[in-house]
Structure formats: structure tokens, C-alpha cells
Amino acid sequence: MAKMRQPRFKLSRRLGVNIYGHPKAMKRAEGIKSRGKKMSDYGIQLLEKQKVRAYYGVMEKQFRRYVEKAMKSKDVTGDALLKLLECRLDNLVYRIGFANSIRQARQMVNHGHILVNGSKVDIPSYEVKVGEEVTLKDKYRKNEMFSNNFLELRTFELPYIEKDYDNFTGKLIRIPNREEIPIEVNEVAVVELYSK
């Protein structure tokens, strides 16, 4: 399976946003804004696409499929794109708090640590439906890394996800609105790039 191999902190600094949430990621990032000439429209569109791909850890071929699917939606294309990505299983494992990064969440899914409605799903791109429960397998609940992630992130709540801390479960209760999705990107620029 293809992976995004660029060092995480270097990627965050290059894109000008803290993709992975680590406090050290943006060290020396201030120089980015003052470097070089004013960016062209194409440059801005390309940068925004790279941000979205980095946030969700999606490769180009797969990302293009998401864009094409979003373009067929009745919703605003940019909003539809982010909603599709937000409902990926690996992303929801991260949003629920089982993992401290998208990379760790994808690894957990690949290794069979996650159940959806009681059944193992090991496909990171699986599209979680409204009402489906995402659960950490029993035998991994005593793993300090996973349990600490889940309990330490109690303060990070999203209105479209319901958490059950006693049972290590999260549920997608509705599709999120764009303003609720916690990523800093210009999705309109991304759509413009693929509309040419």
C-alpha cells in the first residue's frame, strides 16, 4: 500500500499549517510566509490540495476519486469533499480519540484493532455511515497508549460524534457541517484545481 513518506514536521512547515497537532511541528515555520514571491492562483490551489491530502493521509489517485464523487453530489462540491473524507474510518478513529494522529489511526485499522457495529473492519478508507458505532477491540483497551489517548482527549468533543468512554466506543450521529470540521483549508481552491 502506498504511503506518504515525507517527514511529518517538515511537511507541516512546508504547508504552513500544523497537520499533525504536535507542538514541535511548526518550529521555524515563520520563515515560510516571507519566503519567495507572491504565490500564483495555481500555486495556492496546489498548496490547498496538498494540505487536504496531508490532513487525511490520502494519496493522489484516491484523492482524485473523492473529488470526482464530490462533484456528483448535490451539496457544494468543496463541502461534499471534506464530508466524504471526514467519514473515513481511519479519520473517525482519530477524531474519536483512539489514536493521536491519522497515521496511528490507519495503522490501528490495518492491524484489526477496530470494530464497526461489532465486526472487524481493516480498510482505512471504509466510509462510516450515520448511526454506525466504531469500537476499540476489548483486548486493546488495556493498552496504555490507546486508553490514554482516549481518556486524555475527553475535552476534544465534536458535535457529530457521540462518545461512550466506558465502552470505548464512538458513533457518527450525523454528517458534519463544514464549519464543524476542524481543518484549516480552502476547499474551494482545491475544487478549482480539479475543475480545469
From Swiss-Prot:
Any single GO CC term annotated in Swiss-Prot or TrEMBL for this entry: small ribosomal subunit
InterPro entries from the UniProt entry: Ribosomal_uS4 (IPR022801), Ribosomal_uS4_bac-type (IPR005709), Ribosomal_uS4_CS (IPR018079), Ribosomal_uS4_N (IPR001912), S4_RNA-bd (IPR002942), S4_RNA-bd_sf (IPR036986)
Location of the S4 RNA-binding domain: 87-148
Keywords: Ribonucleoprotein, Ribosomal protein, RNA-binding, rRNA-binding
Alphabetical GO biological process terms: ribosomal small subunit biogenesis; translation
Keyword Protease included in the entry's annotation: no
Domain of life: Bacteria
The keyword Membrane is annotated on this UniProt entry: no
GO molecular function: rRNA binding; structural constituent of ribosome
Pfam families: Ribosomal_S4 (PF00163), S4 (PF01479)
UniProt record similarity statement: Belongs to the universal ribosomal protein uS4 family.
Function: One of the primary rRNA binding proteins, it binds directly to 16S rRNA where it nucleates assembly of the body of the 30S subunit.
UniProt xrefs under HAMAP family: Ribosomal_uS4_B
Subunit and interaction comment: Part of the 30S ribosomal subunit. Contacts protein S5. The interaction surface between S4 and S5 is involved in control of translational fidelity.
Name of this chain's protein: Small ribosomal subunit protein uS4B
